[in-house]
Amino acid sequence: MVAMNADVTIEVLESADDSVLEAFVRLIPLLSGSAPVPDRERVERVLGHAGNTVFAAWGRVRAGEGERRILGLLTLVVIELPTGTEARVEDVVVGGEARGLGLGRALVLAALSAAAVRGVRYVDLTSAPRRVAARRLYQSLGFEPRETGVFRHTLDAYR
């Protein structure tokens, strides 16, 4: 657990209780209008996958108001390859009411720290050009644009 202040902490999610499921249902659609809303089984598979570490920013938008809840999420995916251990940061999302509070930065820093502990050599992420603030954040944390292209093949079962 990483403490940000008295009201916000960054924690690794281990199980899909109702509050965790509610956060995924509320936050994941903010990533993409085409992303399916995850159900409990999906969230449990994500949390239980050996290569995944899911970080949550728990807190209150305004100190002392209401119950603590998940305000943001990030998934760190560690990949063992013949060339070394690498990682990807995926599905970084902070709810609109909590944007600008430094949660994205705290989530990414927690992921980078966890990756370093696991012996990761590189951490990659992708970010759409329209996400100007997010791209600025990633660059401020040491991520550099790469001269590469991302290719995607959609399997027939998902068309």
Named regions from a protein language model:
Residues 1-18, 156-159:
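Conserved N-terminal entry element of GNAT/NAT acetyltransferase domains
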Residues 25-37:
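Helix-loop element at the rim of GNAT/NAT acetyltransferase active sites that forms part
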Residues 45-59, 88:
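A short helix-loop-beta-strand connector motif used in the catalytic cores of GNAT acetyltransferases and
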Residues 56, 66-78, 88, 93:
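Conserved beta-strand in the GNAT
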Residues 79-89, 99, 146:
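A conserved beta-turn-beta hairpin within the catalytic core of GNAT-like acetyltransferases
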Residues 94, 100-113, 136-140:
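Conserved acetyl-CoA-binding loop-helix of GNAT-fold acetyltransferases
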Residues 105, 129-147, 152-153:
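Conserved active-site alpha-helix within GNAT-family acetyltransferase domains
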Residues 115-127:
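Conserved GNAT acetyl-CoA-binding A-motif
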